[in-house]
C-alpha cells in the first residue's frame, strides 16, 4: 500500500494492490540509471538473480476520500509502530466506512504478519472460500495453495461452486520462474478438470494482479498470492469490499482479463526433477 497525506486533505491518496517497488511495475523498458552509480541498473537476466527486469501487469485501487485515506494510513502506520515483542501490527483488519455518497456496503482493510499472527490471513481466505455459495472468480498468477486453502477449494467444488481463474501459468521472467511455473502446472494438473483456468496472454508481460470476487457481491483487491509464501512468510495487505454495486463496477475489469486470456490445457508437462522436488512439503512451503 502507498499512502500520502497532504496538507490539503483533498489531495491525500491511498493506493492498495499488488504492485511492488520495482521499475518493471512502472515502465515498459529498463530505465538508464547510469547517471546514478549508487542505483541498481536492472538487466534482462533470468533465474534467481535480483538484477532482472520484467514488465508486469498489475491492478490497484485508489482512495481519495480524506477520512478513508486517513484510516488506511493509520492502519499502515501500525506496521512501523508494531509491537516490539511479538512483531504484530494490530489489529489484523479494520472497517472502512464510506461517506454516504458512495454505494452502500462494507469494506475492511487487512495487514497480515503470518509468522506472528497465527496465519490469520490463511484462516480469513479459508472462511471466504467456505462462504461461497455459487461462484468464485479469481485473477492471480501464483497457484500453490496451502493445504488448508486447498481443502476449502475442494469443499467449494464439492458443493457445486463454480471457480474461474485467470492466471499466468508460464512465469518466465519472474524471479525463479521455472520453479513457479512447475508449481502452477501442478495446480493445473490437480484442478484443471474441475476449475476453469485461463492463462493471461500479453507480449512480454507477466500478470501480477490479485483479485478475488465471490458470489457477485464480495471483491478482494490485495497483494495476496494464492501460494504458501503469502500465507506463511510474507506480510500482505488488501481491501475486502462486500457490496454488489462495487462488484458491478469490477466485473468489466475482470471480463477484460478474460478477453486477454486463453483456456489452459490440462495435459501439462512437468519435468520429473520438479515433481520430486515439490513432493517435499517443506519445499512447497517455501514458495
What is the predicted function of each stretch?
Residues 1-287:
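Charged, low-complexity intrinsically disordered terminal segments
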Amino acid at each position: 500500500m502507498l499512502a500520502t497525506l497532504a496538507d490539503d486533505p483533498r489531495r491525500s491518496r491511498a493506493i492498495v494492490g499488488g504492485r511492488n517497488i520495482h521499475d518493471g511495475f512502472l515502465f515498459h523498458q529498463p530505465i538508464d540509471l547510469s547517471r546514478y552509480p549508487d542505483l541498481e541498473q536492472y538487466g534482462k537476466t533470468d533465474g534467481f538473480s535480483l538484477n532482472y527486469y520484467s514488465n508486469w501487469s498489475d491492478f490497484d485501487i485508489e482512495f481519495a476520500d480524506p477520512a478513508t485515506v486517513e484510516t488506511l494510513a493509520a492502519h499502515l502506520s501500525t506496521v512501523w509502530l508494531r509491537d516490539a515483542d511479538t512483531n504484530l501490527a494490530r489489529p489484523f483488519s479494520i472497517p472502512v466506512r464510506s461517506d454516504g455518497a458512495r454505494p452502500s456496503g462494507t469494506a475492511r482493510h487487512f495487514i497480515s504478519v503470518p509468522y506472528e499472527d497465527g496465519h490469520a490471513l490463511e484462516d480469513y481466505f479459508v472462511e471466504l472460500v467456505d462462504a461461497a455459495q455459487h461462484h468464485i472468480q479469481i485473477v492471480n498468477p501464483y497457484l500453490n495453495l496451502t493445504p488448508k486453502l486447498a481443502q476449502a477449494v475442494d469443499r467449494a467444488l464439492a458443493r457445486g461452486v463454480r471457480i474461474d481463474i485467470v492466471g499466468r501459468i508460464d512465469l518466465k521472467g519472474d524471479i525463479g520462474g521455472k520453479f513457479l511455473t512447475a508449481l502452477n502446472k501442478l495446480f493445473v494438473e490437480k484442478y484443471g478438470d474441475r476449475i476453469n483456468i485461463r492463462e493471461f496472454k500479453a507480449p512480454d508481460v507477466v500478470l501480477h494482479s490479485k483479485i478475488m470476487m465471490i458470489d457477485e457481491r464480495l471483491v478482494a483487491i490485495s497483494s495476496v498470492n494464492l501460494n504458501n509464501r503469502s500465507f506463511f512468510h510474507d506480510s500482505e495487505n488488501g481491501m475486502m469490499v462486500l457490496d454488489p454495486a462495487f462488484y458491478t463496477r469490477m466485473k468489466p475489469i475482470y471480463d477484460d482479463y478474460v478477453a486477454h486470456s486463453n483456456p489452459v490445457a490440462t495435459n501439462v508437462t512437468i519435468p520429473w526433477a520438479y515433481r520430486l522436488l515439490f513432493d517435499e512439503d517443506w519445499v512447497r512451503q517455501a514458495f
